[in-house]
Amino acid sequence: MDLVEKLKNDVKEIEDWIIQIRRKIHENPELSYKEYSTSKLVAETLRKLGIEVEEGVGLPTAVVGKIRGNKPGKTVALRADMDALPVEETSDVEFKSKVKGVMHACGHDTHVAMLLGGAYLLVKNKDLISGEIRLIFQPAEEDGGLGGAKPMIEAGVMNGVDYVFGIHISSSYPSGVFATRKGPIMATPDAFKIVVHGKGGHGSAPHETIDPIFISLQIANAIYGITARQIDPVQPFVISITTIHSGTKDNIIPDDAEMQGTIRSLDENVRSKAKDYMRRIVSSICGIYGATCEVKFMEDVYPITVNNPEVTDEVMKILSSISTVVETEPVLGAEDFSRFLQKAPGMYFFLGTRNEKKGCIYPNHSSKFCVDEDVLKLGALAHALLAIKFSNK
Amino acid sequence: MDLVEKLKNDVKEIEDWIIQIRRKIHENPELSYKEYSTSKLVAETLRKLGIEVEEGVGLPTAVVGKIRGNKPGKTVALRADMDALPVEETSDVEFKSKVKGVMHACGHDTHVAMLLGGAYLLVKNKDLISGEIRLIFQPAEEDGGLGGAKPMIEAGVMNGVDYVFGIHISSSYPSGVFATRKGPIMATPDAFKIVVHGKGGHGSAPHETIDPIFISLQIANAIYGITARQIDPVQPFVISITTIHSGTKDNIIPDDAEMQGTIRSLDENVRSKAKDYMRRIVSSICGIYGATCEVKFMEDVYPITVNNPEVTDEVMKILSSISTVVETEPVLGAEDFSRFLQKAPGMYFFLGTRNEKKGCIYPNHSSKFCVDEDVLKLGALAHALLAIKFSNK
Amino acid sequence: MDLVEKLKNDVKEIEDWIIQIRRKIHENPELSYKEYSTSKLVAETLRKLGIEVEEGVGLPTAVVGKIRGNKPGKTVALRADMDALPVEETSDVEFKSKVKGVMHACGHDTHVAMLLGGAYLLVKNKDLISGEIRLIFQPAEEDGGLGGAKPMIEAGVMNGVDYVFGIHISSSYPSGVFATRKGPIMATPDAFKIVVHGKGGHGSAPHETIDPIFISLQIANAIYGITARQIDPVQPFVISITTIHSGTKDNIIPDDAEMQGTIRSLDENVRSKAKDYMRRIVSSICGIYGATCEVKFMEDVYPITVNNPEVTDEVMKILSSISTVVETEPVLGAEDFSRFLQKAPGMYFFLGTRNEKKGCIYPNHSSKFCVDEDVLKLGALAHALLAIKFSNK
Amino acid sequence: MDLVEKLKNDVKEIEDWIIQIRRKIHENPELSYKEYSTSKLVAETLRKLGIEVEEGVGLPTAVVGKIRGNKPGKTVALRADMDALPVEETSDVEFKSKVKGVMHACGHDTHVAMLLGGAYLLVKNKDLISGEIRLIFQPAEEDGGLGGAKPMIEAGVMNGVDYVFGIHISSSYPSGVFATRKGPIMATPDAFKIVVHGKGGHGSAPHETIDPIFISLQIANAIYGITARQIDPVQPFVISITTIHSGTKDNIIPDDAEMQGTIRSLDENVRSKAKDYMRRIVSSICGIYGATCEVKFMEDVYPITVNNPEVTDEVMKILSSISTVVETEPVLGAEDFSRFLQKAPGMYFFLGTRNEKKGCIYPNHSSKFCVDEDVLKLGALAHALLAIKFSNK
């Protein structure tokens, strides 16, 4: 029996076990950095499988499991993120979140369950492994600021890793379909803050003021011009001004106006070109009117998630042995799996869960987000298959 | 001795008395509708002058004094507003405000003192009066919403009034200079609120949202086009967008965006044309993108302050007997003295207090606003002179 | 019989004569600098009245008549412009223009006829004149560039003039009503040209170009912001972008874009503030994108037309003896009578010709513009009356 | 010897012959629909090679050659376009264009030479062909309006064709590199014209006009918002406003304003969404101000060029046997080879000619565009190889 057949049979035995783990985590969602019970469940489950476990790797709730093969080989890391979102669950699944205002609305509960399933398969087929399989259970992917990957990497989680793989469940693709692409697959999220310092005054006498709202209008228009005119239109790219706040009263022109937003790009040149234009636009337009300004970009944001082309070609062939694999467009969301890919070649890929019949049609982050649990076994299978294949390269 | 000489002499006697009243009020500023101690001081002072006093006219802190001439004649109303502003005084006068965060930054303390000075002169020259002089001490001019004039009028303060006059101290004109104009002199302040209801979503996928901030940009640009293209450029007119609020997080496009501001005009046709355009702009631009919207104009705002042309011609001649009188440009601030002028012909005029030597250079509403007290006697004199002249018409 | 009664009777005798002169000129309209037959008619008519005539004063078609009083007195200049407009007349008067594409659409034919009528009255009442009455028949007011006034002034036409008056017929006011105002009455027309030099390229690859049209959009939006935010909203002021030209083909982004327009203001500070902002806006916004630019303002344009306040007060009283006189809003059109007013105190005023019953309802410069000829005698009368009164001051 | 080796040897023999043909055509460039001498040269050359020739296929200058295999098989079409551009050549090659203002600035001369080279190879290896190889020499690709492909198709050129291939030389890729991609590779060029009909008037009185330039500003801003906010930012997409014309004089607001430009997209849904928004934007914004408008999209423009995914996979493997093959980003230029791909599966691909050492660095359509002639044999080889492989499928 070939490897795929073997693993397919094995995963059938534990399908329900995987689902139950997922539901338990779904009922007890925990926000970024507070994944205490989830990480405890992971550590216990790994230990029950006889896997070497290290807790608190870089972060209190970070867990790493290690399965060593009987012969030398490559070190393959498999990653699952664990945190939930500040969303009030409105879907009516029986295992609905029991925590007010917190929900696994992005499927990280399924990621943990699928990787524990993969761990089970790997332990059961330990003889097929070479080198080391490193199971990374990462907190705080949704944090969007520092993020959980960075501290784990600083704590050495990627030392000696030859390949790294990560799966994300997504309602953008049909149930059971794997979707990925070579090169950049997810964007870097350059959060920005623009503050215009004008000089307030009476609403009836704008000429005696430096009107920060009017200036912000000109800046915002020019910023949207960056997308429409300055960036290569073939490049996936977007700037969104997502907050604007200024003023208190209808007859008082305020002193200051503040805008925040995000620049999403998949290319470092495009990224720096956009930021340069933004700085020039803000300072030049403020200069016209004698206003002063601040333009701040959040530092050390998640990098661009770049799939290694050769690895991706190979993985797509491997995965096509267990399901349909499609080449997807890039996504302008962001993922700190990108930091792992900066340390070792690997691939980040989506596992589709969209199933009209089962009502699994809502986008990730929606309060009605729901998952076709039939796909979970495929995730576990993919983890195990890649671990075995690449550890033996 | 002619009337002017007589009154000039009389006012010299009480100049210091007027100044002390002003300083007492300045030290104890009271916000709109809470002018308790100021109105008590007014009522007591009027009674000491033997003047018939009515308190609580339309508002608890409103005070009206009546001086009746010995022979029939016209009823002339003289008005002074009493409220202070939510401003922290930073000027270093010895009689600085003793109330944290409250200051007579618009000179209403001087208005009360000057009208009490005028009352003194009228009592002293009672024989020269015909008909009735009605002294209106009005709360809450700065309120900007309902305002104190309206309830006083509804309580009958303007019943039977033939002429009405009001003075406002202003650092826009040189000390002692009277400034006014025929026809519209101050604007109506149409406060507006625009709410754009879009559909929020992820900052990286604007195409899946109805972006209320982007829509508000287009609306704001078109609104400023009303001033630049749709309103007669000879007409004093301004629209100011003074607040804009939308969004909470750099990567989330919000559902809604809210803007507030003010339309200032001196002409009813211009006013309704501007409001029509604003409604059309907001609904049309929202319509392009499938957003819904609300456009609200505050109701029953202060009317346009319109000086009666004939009365103004006559008053300018009278005042030129006691000081320099200039014809001023209209001002796009607002005043609820306009409501009194809707009930009887009259005139609203400024008394200059700008004096570089004395450091009286800061604009009204400034935390450093200060008054050249030498002009106060002129205000009292003007009140008395107009009362006598017009009561005898 | 007083002066006004005398002149009223005299002008009745020549009313028809004035109307016939007007109609003759109306049938033979001549464009700026080409008023050959009109100026010939003027010279002949003056000579027939025994008036001393000088032709070619500064311009070939300029004519000056001089009537000297018997006793010393003031020199009073009265001015009428003579040129027509490049407009195809579509009104159906029997004395319609006989010249294709040229029409007296702004009433300069009536100005000539009224001043010749005034000359007749002055000759007839020569004894009432002191000093000298100087009749200025000026070419090329409509030229908008150099204009006819400047060369005539350089040729000495205003040497020794004490007062100068000019009438303009206008359908903005009711028939027979005089309208004027103290101070600035007409604007200075700062014509501007903005050229943005970008770098063209393919319409599908804007990022490889410096798109002059996009840049011009930002500039134009900011320019309209000058009106809405930077200039005192009480000041009559307008900027109009009246031409924009760029590009030849739908798939080629051009190199350059050119805009023209006009700034109209009644105040030198406002004027220079607007021009400064325009320069800063164009250079700053071009600077953002690496474009270069030119901002040119036409030189030596017609100045602001400023009526002398004292003279205006006096003239309004004089004119009220022959008709209704109203104080008008300023007009943002331009007039090179302004150059005469820079040389001597005087007044420029409108004579209304709007008459619904007679169908005289079209605005000046309209191809259907028509005049209520009953008012022409009033214009002649006004010229004579002012000449007599001010020459005797 | 395998097929590739055989063809490589054969093409060496005729490399110079191919280059000479190219240079002859380069010296005698002919604009769209006027490729008389080029098509004569093609017909003669084909006949000399013993190939069945048909001239005037749908267009006078269109030429089709047919090479029939000895055994049944597939019909494979190979296409080369023939027209030059209205560009004055400024490159200093010895075989520079001899026709003023006309130049082969896009390499269509090389396309003809490479396809004639391919024809030579196919005739020489006729025994390896099955079915039919149809050589399409197409006029007027650069025309951008109707284009040459459409009439040839209507004349039956694609009847019975099983596969179709087209090569385009491009300085965007290194010399000798083949570049292509599955799915959409070039855009559909929706040329648009927007006319705003307002109501002109005097530059000083915009409120009496419906200002078409101001309205066009609002429209243009909103149009660029389509790119920035309404279209999926991952989608290659651009709108360029490339011409704007309005107005004649600095003091006259014109009646009308006209804009032209192009929408480039690779997806029919995106394309129709953009056009819908454009219509809504123009009509809604015109509606605000009472202007009327026209929005016209050029009809029957070149479709999206869509490479058949399966054929592309196969071709990329075949071509990798003779040179480097890279997967390229889509290009937002347009090509009427797209019409051939609507009739039969096939692939359009680029052949790189960028060679710094040889100074071949200028973009297509540049007056300095020049080609590294060493690559021409590769193009001939590719034509022959694909014809043989796919005719035998």
Curated annotation (Swiss-Prot), chains A, B, C, D:
Catalytic residues (UniProt): Y302 (proton donor), E373 (nucleophile)
Annotated binding of Zn(2+), by residue: H104, D109, H245
Single Gene Ontology BP annotation: proteolysis
Pfam families, per the entry: M20_dimer (PF07687), Peptidase_M20 (PF01546)
Domain of life: Archaea
Protein family membership: Belongs to the peptidase M20 family.
Protein's recorded name: Thermostable carboxypeptidase 2
